[in-house]
């Protein structure tokens, strides 16, 4: 279950289904990612075709990422069965 979301627009999408804070062409994929994160109990639950799940390195070690589109990612970390620090980033 998602416990914390860093990105204000992503939080608005998750809590209120209001996509004004995210890129409009990403809204549908972001809804899918958030729904799957909310239902996920383990990181393996996020290994879905098209998400390109991968662990992050360096300063972001401990986080995982899934692809939204091009260079946009949703990053997050797991603690027990909870999903924490969900963020929506352009990594370039």
Language model features: what each stretch is:
Residues 1, 9, 18, 42, ...:
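Glycine-rich, flexible loop/turn motifs
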Residues 1-33:
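Arg/Lys-rich, positively charged N-terminal/basic patches that mediate binding to nucleic acids
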Residues 15, 42, 81:
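Residue-level marker of positions within ordered structural domains that often coincide
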Residues 24, 28-31, 47-50, 70:
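Generic alpha-helical scaffold signal
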Residues 25-27, 60, 87-90:
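Short, surface-exposed linear patches
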Residues 37:
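Conserved phosphate-interacting/catalytic interface
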Residues 41-64:
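A short, surface-exposed loop/turn module that caps and links secondary-structure elements
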Residues 54, 65-92:
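Enriched for short, Lys/Arg-rich terminal
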